[in-house]
């Protein structure tokens, strides 16, 4: 995907928002202090718009975020806190059946309740909510990674029941992914963690130390086993 500033600055509709255009232009040039002054002026202006105008801006901006990389260059704290969060929260209250504000809040904004927003987007939008679906799966895969990232030191940081349930939920979500290659990649990752969990359960029934050696002797093909084994 293309850098977000490149996508925004070449967009025809940017001229509708001259102060936001100035912010992006200055940001692209690396003039952070000056860019934030323009952003502050833009936020003050946008707060005066009616809800419809604010929602139109949000639709335009988040659509660009969905097809861009490095969105942190534009989605800076003042823009999120002072404009986008309040805007989306009002939108959810005024039109609770629209999945878009839930999707954007869960995918892009800083919140402890990301999963709840994404589940709401899926509930309302169904299979059309592919970005919400993929984001949820990524969150689950990151949680599984955390559970196992010290496993070579005989340290499992997860809960067996919780991770078993997480794997099942993730497979259910992945069955709704439309892109076949993405679904295949996710399945491979989920199979990896499922095998690892199964082996850890089997290992702990036999012993408490030496999981790497146990995997080596069992012929398990985890990428970290041989590397760790040879280093020793």
Language-model region placement:
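Tetratricopeptide repeat
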Residues: 35, 121, 170-173
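Canonical positions in the second alpha-helix
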Residues: 90-91, 120-124
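Short, composition-biased local secondary-structure segments
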Residues: 84-92
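Long, ordered, amphipathic alpha-helical scaffolds
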Residues: 150-232
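Helical anchoring/docking segments at protein termini
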Residues: 1-47, 199-232
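A short acidic, amphipathic alpha-helical/loop segment
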Residues: 116-121, 135
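Amphipathic alpha-helical repeat scaffolds of TPR domains
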Residues: 11-24, 45-72, 94-111, 129-151, ...
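Helix-turn-helix repeat elements of alpha-solenoid scaffolds
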Residues: 27-41, 72-85, 109-115, 163-167
């Amino acid at each position: 995907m293309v850098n977000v500033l490149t996508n925004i600055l070449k967009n025809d509709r940017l001229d509708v928002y001259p102060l936001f255009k100035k912010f992006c232009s200055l940001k692209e040039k690396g003039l952070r202090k000056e860019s934030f002054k323009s952003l502050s002026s833009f936020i003050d202006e946008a707060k005066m718009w009616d809800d419809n105008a604010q929602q139109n801006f949000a639709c335009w901006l988040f659509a660009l975020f969905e097809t861009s990389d490095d969105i942190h260059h534009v989605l800076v704290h003042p823009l999120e806190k002072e404009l986008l969060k309040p805007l989306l929260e009002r939108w959810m209250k005024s039109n609770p059946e629209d999945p878009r504000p839930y999707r954007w809040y869960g995918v892009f904004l800083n919140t402890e309740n990301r999963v709840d927003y994404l589940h709401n987007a899926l509930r309302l939008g169904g299979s059309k909510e592919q970005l919400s679906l993929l984001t949820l799966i990524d969150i689950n895969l990151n949680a599984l990674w955390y559970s196992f990232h010290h496993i070579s030191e005989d340290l499992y940081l997860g809960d067996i029941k919780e991770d078993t349930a997480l794997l099942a939920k993730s497979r259910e979500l992945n069955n709704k992914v439309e892109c076949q290659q993405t679904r295949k990649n996710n399945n491979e990752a989920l199979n990896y963690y499922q095998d690892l969990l199964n082996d850890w359960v089997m290992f702990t029934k036999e012993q408490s130390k030496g999981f790497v050696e146990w995997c080596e002797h069992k012929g398990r093909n985890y990428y970290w086993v041989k590397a760790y084994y040879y280093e020793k």
